[in-house]
From Swiss-Prot:
GO terms for biological process: defense response to bacterium; innate immune response. This is Beta-defensin 104A. It comes from Pongo pygmaeus (Bornean orangutan). Belongs to the beta-defensin family. It comes from the Eukaryota. Pfam families: Defensin_beta_2. The keyword Isomerase does not apply.
Length: 72
């Protein structure tokens, strides 16, 4: 009976998504200073690679109309 309780407790601990890294490493700057390290990129961000802490390097999407502006 003890083994069953022990196995249940261990499986519950392993099932949880325990943070391996500190919370300070979540919003680190990556991508030559233009992006952020996140567990998952937000809906308005592109994933451009991986951070040293194995999280995704997320770059904010930009409005293409701002890039193609021409002065009259």
């Amino acid at each position: 009976m003890r083994r069953l309780v022990l196995l249940l407790a261990i499986s519950l601990l392993l099932y949880q998504d325990l943070p391996v890294r500190s919370e300070f490493e979540l919003d680190r700057i990556c991508g030559y200073g233009t992006a952020r390290c996140r567990k998952k990129c937000r809906s308005q961000e592109y994933r451009i690679g991986r951070c040293p802490n194995t999280y995704a390097c997320c770059l904010r999407k930009w409005d293409e109309s701002l890039l193609n502006r021409t002065k009259p």
